[in-house]
Structures are given as C-alpha cells and as structure tokens.
Amino acid sequence: MIRADLATIPTYVPGRRLNNATKLSSNEVSFSPLPAAVDAVTEATQGANRYPDMGAVELREALAEHLEVEFDQVTVGCGSSALCQQLVQATCAQGDEVIFPWRSFEAYPIFAQVAGATPVAIPLTADQNHDLDAMAAAITDKTRLIFICNPNNPSGTTITQAQFDNFMEKVPNDVVVGLDEAYFEFNRADDTPVATEEIHRHDNVIGLRTFSKAYGLAGLRVGYAFGNAEIIAAMNKVAIPFAVNSAAQAAALASLNSADELMERVEETVEKRDAVVAALGTAPTQANFVWLPGEGAAELAAKLAEHGIVIRAFPEGARISVTNAEETDKLLRAWEAINAG
C-alpha cells in the first residue's frame, strides 16, 4: 500500500521546543513581523473565503523589481524549502543524481529521494565549508542538480567568488545549480557569489531565498526563486496549486516594501552574532547562528536546556541561533554557568 522505499527516507526533524524556554534551535528571528505586515495580514484575512491569487502576481511583480529581473524569471512558494523540492522535481527523474554539501540543509537528501533521485552528499572541508572541488568531481552523466547553500546551514560559512567561478567552469550547462541563500540578509562577506549576479552569468543557476528568516514570516511560509525563465516555468508546473495563501502573500509584499525597517532589525542580530562568536569562541559566521563542530552536541544541548535554552544538536556539532539582546544575554549567562561548573 505504501512505497517500499519510503522506509529508507529520513524524516525531516524540526528544531526542538520546550515550554517556557528560549528557542534558539530553528534560526528564527525573535521579533514579531513588521507592523505593515501585521496590518496586511489582518486585511487579507477578510477575504479568506476566496482562494488566493495562484500566480501571486502582485508579489512576483514586486520581487521582479526588487531583484531587477523579468516577471517570468521569479516565482514564489511555500517557503524556499518547497521551492528546493520543486527544483528537484522539475529537473530529476528516477535514477538521476542530486549533489549537495554535507552537513547542510537536511532536507536536500529527503527531497532527492522522494523524487526517486539519488542523493550524493559531499562532506564539508576541515574548515566546515563546501568542498567545491569534490562536488565538481562527483558530477556524472546522471547529475541533474547541485545545491550550494551560501551561507551554509549549519556551519555559517561562505564560499568565495573565485571558488564559485572555478566550480561553475566544471559544471555542464545542462546541470542546474540551486544557489540557496536563505540567510542572505545576514551575510556580510565581502568576497562571495550573489545569486542576483550569477543568474546573469549562468543560465543554469537558480537563486533561492526566503521570507522565513530575516523577514520574520516563518509561520506564514513564503519563499522565492529566480533565474532562467524556462526553469522557473518548470518549477511552477510541479508546484502545489494555491500553495502560498493570501495572508502570506500580503505579508511578504508589505515586508518587501519596508526594507529599511527590516534591515535595522537585521543589524541588531548581526551585532549580537559577533558578540556570541567572541564569547563562545566559534569560527566566524555569516548567518543568524553559530556552529560548534565536534562531538558532545547532545550533552551541550542538555546542559543548556537546564538553563532554559533550546539549541539544535547534530551528530557533527551544535547550532545555536542568534536573535536579540535579551535572548543573547540569557544564552551567554547560561554558557558562563556551564563552563564555570
């Protein structure tokens, strides 16, 4: 009755929650949606008896202007994760291959396997970054899609422009590269590729961004993809109808039009991020989290939970979200208490 291969597909595990605890496990922002977004949601719900605009025309028009692309070069989805899945479905058939770094966004292998494709995970380098040489070497005649997560989740590292340029020289034109920039707004790296530029250099690059992180709309689920219009059209073909509801579209549009206010909030997170990096002694990060590689993540998570802090433990290390001043102070007090004991 059920597909036999589903038994081999891992289940996506969200960040842990604890009642009355500070949740630093899902890379969410701590502030509420922008006031304009809240007002837009309130107004949009008045028409909740009607289906949303399936084409999200107004939002896509605004995004096209924001990204400086044509209307048919951008689409929206139920979070950038859904768009990642659509990209897999649009490019891969049974037995095709999807290459991605590991550890990275844990849904990549799930999306590949659900589509009947073969996930090809390439370990990160010793400094927790993409091994682009190894990823390029892994390309075969079955490769259809490559994900690059920049900044990478959970390590927070970024690749350089030269590294990406060298990598793209080795990627066949018929292999799509999904440049996942979910944490783009937090990225302060001077030397790194940016999808809005790369899509004009390479017809096989698709940019992926989200309103779930910096924009504070994780609960509404809106992401966007942009690039080659032919690939975007294929992604739309495999999308679930009416996937982005009216309230989500309205909130995303209002947030996009309040960029200055948004960036003030982002700068607070970046400031606190640098303080956490210094206090915990982690490597620099270009996202809204820090990464502590190595064993002992589960033990650290348990100790922080005793102090009312929830983080994300992976087999390879621990990821801790960075939010505002209040939650950062609580984290640092807990860290000091643990290390003093």
From Swiss-Prot:
It catalyses: an aromatic L-alpha-amino acid + 2-oxoglutarate = an aromatic oxo-acid + L-glutamate. InterPro entries: Aminotrans_II_pyridoxalP_BS, Aminotransferase_I/II_large, ArAT, HisP_aminotrans, HistidinolP_aminotransfase, PyrdxlP-dep_Trfase, PyrdxlP-dep_Trfase_major, PyrdxlP-dep_Trfase_small. Disulfide bonds: none annotated. The modification N6-(pyridoxal phosphate)lysine is found at K213. Homodimer. This is Aromatic amino acid aminotransferase. One of its GO terms (biological process) is L-histidine biosynthetic process. Its cofactor is pyridoxal 5'-phosphate. Pfam families: Aminotran_1_2 (PF00155). Belongs to the class-II pyridoxal-phosphate-dependent aminotransferase family. Gene3D superfamilies: Aspartate Aminotransferase, domain 1, Type I PLP-dependent aspartate aminotransferase-like (Major domain). It comes from the Bacteria. Keywords: Aminotransferase, Pyridoxal phosphate, Transferase. Aminotransferase that catalyzes the conversion of aromatic amino acids and 2-oxoglutarate into corresponding aromatic oxo acids and L-glutamate. Signal peptide: none annotated.
